[in-house]
Every structure is written in C-alpha cells, then in structure tokens.
Amino acid sequence: MRQKMANNATPPPAYFKTLTIENVKCFKAEQTIDLSDGNGKPAQWTIILGDNNTGKTTLLRCLARFDFRTFINPRENSSEKKISHDESIKSHLLIKESGTWKFKDRFWDEKIAGLIIYGYGTARRMDTSSLSEKENKYATSSLFSDDMTLINAEEWLLQTDYAVKNGVKAAASRLAKIKQVLTSGILPDVTDFRFTTTKDLKSFVEFKTDYGSVRLNELGYGYQSMVAWVVDLAKRLFERYPESENPLAEPSIVLVDEIDLHLHPEWQRKIIQFLTAQFPSTQFIVSSHSPLIVQSANNINLVLLEKQSDHVTIRQPNLTTYQGWTIEEILNELMDLGEKTLSDNYLALIKQFDEALDKEDYAKAKAAYDELDKILHPESSQRKLLRIQMSSLMPETV
C-alpha cells in the first residue's frame, strides 16, 4: 500500500527512461542515454563506467537536478529526460551560469507527483550532530558537495529503539526492517546489532561481528559509509511511504557515485545482489570503477564514457550480463586497459625475453627469465612455457 496524497490519490511510480544531454562540461554534441531495460521498461540497474574526469558525476547531477526540490550550485547545462509510468513525460531543463533555471516546457504533472530522487556522492559521511539540530531536507545534496553529511545513523537507530520501548508501533516495524537490511549480508560479517548504555548513561549501537561486538564508529570506513547511506535512504523511504507495509519495497530512484568506493573485492561482487533484494522497486543509477560490479550483476544497463581528445562520447553495449566474462576481459574490452592489466616491469621483461629469443641470445633470455621467475605467481603455467622456449637456446654440453 503506497503513501496517499492529500486527495487520497496514490502517486504512481516514476522512473527515468532516457537522459539527453548537450553542451554540459565534457559532453559537447547532443547525446542520449537509454535508461531502459531494452523492453520499454526502466532498467533497475544502470552502471556508468569511465576514467576519472569523463563525466560520471556530471551525469548523476544532471539527473538529480530534475527533482525540482534540489537545486544546489547550478552550472550552465541543457538536458532533458523522460519520466516513465504508464506513459512517458518529457521535460527540458536549462540551467544558466548565472544560477537561474527554468523548464523550457511543462514539467509538473500530477502523474509524477511522487517523483523524488535520492542521491549519494563519494563522501558518504554520517553527521555527528543530533537529528533535531540538523536535518538535511535535500535528498541529493551530497552529490553536489562533499561537505554535506548524511543522517546521524546511530542517533536515528537509538531514537527509533527508544520509540519502540515506548510502545510506538510504527517504530517497531521500522527497526525490524532496518535490522533486516543491515544483517542481510550487506555488511560482511555483521550478523546483528544491539543498543548499549554505559554507567554514565551514554548510549551507542554495537554491531555483532565474527570478531566480537564493535561500535559503529569503530567499524571500518567502508562499513560506516554503507550504514550512512543505507540508513539515510531507509529513513527517507519510511517518511515517504508511512502507510506502506514495507516502505523499502516501494518505488524510488537512487543515484550513487562510485558505489564500489571503500568496498573490498568480495563485497563489490555482492553489493548489487543485496541492494536489489532489499530495495526491489528502486531504480539504481550508479557510477563505478570496478569490473567486479559489472561482472556480478545479472541484468544491467551499462553506460561507457569514452574520452575523445576534447570531449566524451557515450557508448552502450547491447549485452545486459557479463557474468561469463573474466575480470581481464572486462578490463580489456569495456574499460580499455589492454596490456595495462599487467605491470610495466612484467611487460618490459617479456619484451626483453622475446627479443633474446629472436636473436638466439641465451644469456639475455636467461637473465630475463630469472627476473620473471621472481615476480610470476607461484602456480603460473607461464613459467613452464618460458622454460620450454628458453631450452631451445640452451648451449649444448659436451
């Protein structure tokens, strides 16, 4: 059951289907990003890949600005989008250098009254002030400024627990749902959390891990960052859909810059799976540098940003899954690393070895091999191949 509007009408789900961008920073000519799944429906996961300074954050900010409640630090740009429910609604937004902005055509429509976008930048830090002192009403502000903090997750959890103990029914449901999220595996090794009060009446949250109980502020930064934005998102969904049996399963749009930031490789492999399970009706549009993120997803809409001298072009492959690709194949073909997946030292030694073979110079080949032998993986099959190649040059013994 979704949140009711004042006139008792339920706002329909609204998602992005396309984004057209022109003359925005590194994007010069008009280009359109398809945000659908190829079958006319919005893709649940769109992943934007590109080198540093190729416009990943710019694209997320362009999308965020279409939530008319959030206009922070505008820059001149022209972009348009289609918002989808049962039909497409197209709007064109112009933001000038002066800071003024306007929609060039009709934007607001009762059919998209429920459109709210949640955005999270790379500095996903929890606020340390109390909830009553500082409430960030702009749901995408951290995308525009690293100084913007997210909800004080620990205090929100403590306040919710206090409300539960005072018999607030809605609080009990919310606490149960956020516990389900945080112990679902989205935080590796975290199996539970509890509320603790010291003798001097200071309260805090302790997370149960394989290594014992750990306070939230003592967890690694990847854990703190994940708790910060996931709890922030959950709180906003609880408030947006107060009448829903499960607000976390309601429609929303979430933008995350560098979703793999501070996550170790195994965590990167599973993060999409966990977020999809906990927020099944959310459209995620995220940027990433991780081939593991690309490899792990079952059905993704991939956006590749490719630098071309003084501008960036947008390319979208037809494939929707890369689960059968190796990490090296993703790095080579999608992230354009080529031989850069190997160290410069390795490449130089291989070149030296090959040149020695061509010149039939055993001494130089042996010198290159000895250095390669030190840096190759202990179980590398290449070591045996190099020895076989070198044996053809081995001096005959009498």
Provide a role label for each language-model segment.
Residues R2-L60, T276:
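Pre-Walker A-like glycine/lysine-rich segment at the N-terminus of P-loop NTPase domains
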Residues R2-N7, T58-A113:
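Conserved P-loop NTP-binding catalytic core
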Residues R2-Y15, D109, A277, L292-V398:
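RecA-like P-loop NTPase motor core
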Residues R2-Y15, E22, L143-A249:
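Extended helical coiled-coil dimerization/tether regions that scaffold
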Residues K41-N77, Y221-K235:
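Phosphate-binding glycine-rich loops of NTP-binding sites
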Residues K96-I186, L331-L334:
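Coupling/switch segment of ABC-type P-loop NTPase heads
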Residues D257-E258:
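Walker B catalytic acidic pair
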Residues S288-H289:
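Conserved H-loop
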